[in-house]
From Swiss-Prot:
One of its GO terms (molecular function) is sodium:proton antiporter activity. It is found in: Cell inner membrane. PANTHER family: NA(+)_H(+) ANTIPORTER NHAB, TRANSPORTER ARSB-RELATED. GO terms for cellular component: plasma membrane. Its main location: membrane. It is a multi-pass membrane protein. It holds the Pfam family NhaB. Na(+)/H(+) antiporter that extrudes sodium in exchange for external protons. The chain crosses the membrane at residues 23-43, 61-80, 97-117, 120-140, 144-164, 202-222, 238-258, 303-323, 348-368, 391-411, 447-467, 475-495. Belongs to the NhaB Na(+)/H(+) (TC 2.A.34) antiporter family. It catalyses: 2 Na(+)(in) + 3 H(+)(out) = 2 Na(+)(out) + 3 H(+)(in). This is Na(+)/H(+) antiporter NhaB. InterPro entries: Na+/H+_antiporter_NhaB.
Amino acid sequence: MEISYGRALWRNFLGQSPDWYKLALIIFLIVNPLVFAVAPFVAGWLLVVEFIFTLAMALKCYPLLPGGLLAIEALLIGMTSPAHVREEIAGNLEVLLLLIFMVAGIYFMKQLLLFVFTRLLLGIRSKMLLSLAFCLAAAFLSAFLDALTVVAVVISVAVGFYGIYHRVASARPDDNDLLDDSHIEQHYREVLEQFRGFLRSLMMHAGVGTALGGVMTMVGEPQNLIIAKAAGWHFGEFFIRMAPVTVPVMVCGLLTCLLVEKYRLFGYGEPLPPTVRKVLQDFDDRSRAQRSRQEQLRLLAQAVIGVWLIVALAFHLAEVGLIGLSVIILATTFSGVTDEHAIGKAFTEALPFTALLTVFFAIVAVIIDQQLFTPVIEFVLQASPHAQLSLFYLFNGLLSSISDNVFVGTVYINEAKTALEHGVISLPQFEMLAVAINTGTNLPSVATPNGQAAFLFLLTSALAPLIRLSYGRMVWMALPYTLVLTLVGLLCVEFTLMPVTNWLLAHGWVTTPTLP
């Protein structure tokens, strides 16, 4: 029997999202104009809370849809103006170009990255050293590349290897249903469960590695570029400015990696079963023997382009997005990718998040127009300059662990910049706050998948159900890293940031720039 038009409309509205979620969004859309008519400030905060809710519920529905509806309504009822949203987008054009071109550029270097992680997985037999290598490799790559892409590559390696062993275990070489374990004997099931534990730990180490490396450079995370632009820092200076906090955090993060593996804590420590290693090694040997000269030259070209990328970023030879565009041109040229549709696939990963980031800027425009964060910032700025650093770090960390860190970082750096322009804080203090904001948004955000886009990407990937990686398990496995990274970051902001930065200034390693 054909359903009614009303029922059909309800089913179409936000698609497969739960009914309670759809109802909640409709209530938000009805309540907001009513509250705005009576108390604009309260309505503004209500909008921010609702938007954070959509980010926290990202697994129910991609936040672009509900967040976009809230932003459109905010524009319609006058909480901000299209002109102000345009100003925010124009001011952050570099970030959008980073997401569009850099992510697409790295897509064409996936073969090289797959090669690197495959060699690590099969070349290192010690689980502790392998975990450390994955964490370090992910950190290094995320300092120059997009964290989402790095995680996507590691996921590709894990899904590929899982599929190889699953087909052997099920005795069905042509079976592509990796979720079906019904044909696997008990012995193989036990080995497969061990293999899942092994892959879970590696994925989490790699995911945390992207956070450790991503906080260190201005291209590591999208919000870093926003903060760097606000502070007037180039690639090298950003790295040096962050070093008093990020270097100790990196060391402690790597030590945490070793400790949880050695003592098998929080679900870590599962080694690669010998039977699985043999199957994977045999497959890799066959693949290497069949690799043509054309494929070998493709890998070499990608390695050279990788060197160009690092050099171009380090010496700031062009804007980040333009460097990404050069990577697309060079990588496609020397990989022989000439078809428009093949090139178009590279942009599918980044564009949904780019659209979501544009919605962020609309919400930021509301925050500025309604002066929502003014009371919070005034409260923080009443504290002593030294205490301000820890308060900014903690406020950022708390919000970033439940919301998207790009959104949080953008809001707080804008508020700090406004305080500087009004003479409330000095330029040196603003620079210290920029470090506290950057580290506060990046480090505690590993607590949940909501804070780190790379974690959310992993949780929603095809790999997660295969290796039994649920939301709760991910939070549990991230817990030791969350505690260590957050506490060490706070201690560094409190005790090492000011003295080390003053030493760097005194010795000419960094200078106080003239802000735009």
